[in-house]
Structures are given as C-alpha cells and as structure tokens.
C-alpha cells in the first residue's frame, strides 16, 4: 500500500508541537531527522536533545487529503504562510528486507569479522561474531566500536581476563572471548544493555565465560589484564580512578568514545596511572591505549 509523506523543516523548539498536531490530523508515523547534518555528541545526563534544525517527517494513508492539514499548519505563528515543506507519495516496500540489506559482514584487523545472522559468513576459518542490530547500540559500524575491535584483534588474548566497561550490545566482550580471552566481565548502567550482551553471548556460545554487572553490583576486588571502555569523555574522566584500579600492573587499556579534540586531555589525565600511547583516529573519533604502571 502506498503512503503520503509530509516533510516539514522546523527547529528543535517546535518539532514536538508539530508532531502532536500531525498525529491529531491522522498521521500513522512521525520521525525526526537532522536538518543540517549536525551531530549531537555528548548530551547532558537525562537529556535526549533534538537537532537545532529538525525535519519532521509524517506518514499518512495514501487516501488522506492533506489540504486541510497544510492550511492548519499555515496558521501557526512559528511556521507561517510560506513554511518549508514537501509532500510526496511513498511506494510500499518490504521495509524489513530493505533494512536488512543495509547490513553486511565487516572485517576488523586480520582475524575478526562481525556478521549479521542472515548473511553468509565470508570466511568460516576466521574469528566470526554473529551479531544483529538491536536495541543496544554497537554493531561495529560506528568508528569508536571499529577502533576498539581493531585493537582487540591486534592483541594476544589467550588466557587473559578482560573487562568491557560500558558493554552496550556486548560486541567487544563477545569479540574478546572469540579471540581467546579466558573470561570477560561486562559492566553497563542499562538493564537493556545487560540483556543484549547476554543474548549475544549466548548466540555466539560464549555466555559461560561472560559475567555481567550493573556498576553498583560489580565485585569490589575486580581486576583484569585488559580493559576496554567505549563510552564518552565525561564518564571516562569521572571514572578514571576506578578504571585504573581495575587494571592489573602491566595490563592493557583502550579508551574510545572520544572526539579528536578531547583525546589529548583524556590521555594526559590517564597518564597518572598508565603509560599512554599516541591516539589513533578514525573520522572525528579517537582511541587511546596504554599500559598500567
């Protein structure tokens, strides 16, 4: 069945109001898009901000007459008579199939592949992690995840104990186990992340070697040979003493979730406890590594 799509250029202050009005007008779906490719890298705790320039996209049944809706929108003082909008017909598709077609196996380093479950594994002899996009982020496509996966692939993790701080989907924890780690402890503040990590570990037959905790439940004496933390600069700085305490003397550290301009400050801060290496960059993001003093 075809649909009618209405796109309205607005701003973050008015997007929610427009969304509510369009739902009252019979829209079956509302989404928000970035109007000017402006990333939001580190929102304040508890906030889910919109982009300053926001596009409200509404879907209506193909038989809907949008003339009254457009007329109503023109009366809104924050839009006005000549507000920027576009109406177009959208042909129905197998959207699930279209979404699935966008995900392909990705190689990281020399040994490691991340493969969606519906794709054929390119190299059965490689280290293959089966992972589908889901509620908890982290499928290898983001530069910070890729940087961490490449680092893990470069290590000899045989019989090493690993901590994944901010485990999200569990992609780094599962990858470490598939690469030979003795065991991994995953820590995250989100129950959904804990559940997703457990499910992905079970899918990859490594759940028996993965322990998962909320921060308040982690063992007080927890230590590891390798710690990877793919979170944001603020939490990395705040948690630095705890992260340092969790790494054994001579152990390895990787930090990501950092913008290029944040890397030097975080590296300098962690140098209290670690001999830090030069930052590695991918697009706008950075990875820091170091060895525990």
Swiss-Prot record:
EC numbers, comma separated: 2.1.1.-
Cellular compartments annotated: Cytoplasm
CDD domains hit by this protein: AdoMet_MTases
Example of a GO MF term: protein-lysine N-methyltransferase activity
InterPro entries: Ribosomal_L11_MeTrfase_PrmA, Ribosomal_PrmA_MeTrfase, SAM-dependent_MTases_sf
One annotated Gene Ontology cellular component of this protein: cytosol
Function, in words: Methylates ribosomal protein L11.
Family stated for the protein in its record: Belongs to the methyltransferase superfamily. PrmA family.
Official protein name in the record: Ribosomal protein L11 methyltransferase
Organism this protein belongs to: Shewanella baltica (strain OS155 / ATCC BAA-1091)
Gene name in the database record: prmA
């Amino acid at each position: 069945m075809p649909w009618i799509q209405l796109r309205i250029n607005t701003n973050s202050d008015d997007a929610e109001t427009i969304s509510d009005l369009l739902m009252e007008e019979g829209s079956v779906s509302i989404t928000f898009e970035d109007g000017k490719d402006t990333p939001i890298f580190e929102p304040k705790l508890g906030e889910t901000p919109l982009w300053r320039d926001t596009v409200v996209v509404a879907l209506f049944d193909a038989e809907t007459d949008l003339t009254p809706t457009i007329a109503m929108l023109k009366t809104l003082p924050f839009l006005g008579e000549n507000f920027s909008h576009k109406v177009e017909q959208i042909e129905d598709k197998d959207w699930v199939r279209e979404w699935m077609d966008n995900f392909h196996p990705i190689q990281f380093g020399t040994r490691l592949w991340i493969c969606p479950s519906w794709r054929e594994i390119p190299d059965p002899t490689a280290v293959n992690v089966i992972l589908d996009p889901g509620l908890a982020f982290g499928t290898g496509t983001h530069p910070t995840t890729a940087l961490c996966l490449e680092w893990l692939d470069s290590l000899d993790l045989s019989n090493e104990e690993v901590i994944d701080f901010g485990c999200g989907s569990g992609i780094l924890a599962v990858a470490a186990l598939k690469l030979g780690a003795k065991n991994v402890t995953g820590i995250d503040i989100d129950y959904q992340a804990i559940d997703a990590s457990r499910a992905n570990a079970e899918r990859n037959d490594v759940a028996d070697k993965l322990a998962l905790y909320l921060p308040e439940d982690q063992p007080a004496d927890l230590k590891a040979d390798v710690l990877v933390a793919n979170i944001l600069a603020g939490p990395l700085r705040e948690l630095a003493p705890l992260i340092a305490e969790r790494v054994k003397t001579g152990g390895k550290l990787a930090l990501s979730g950092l913008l290029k301009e944040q890397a030097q400050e975080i590296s300098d801060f962690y140098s209290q406890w670690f001999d830090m290496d030069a930052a590695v960059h991918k697009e706008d993001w950075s990875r820091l590594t170091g060895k525990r003093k």
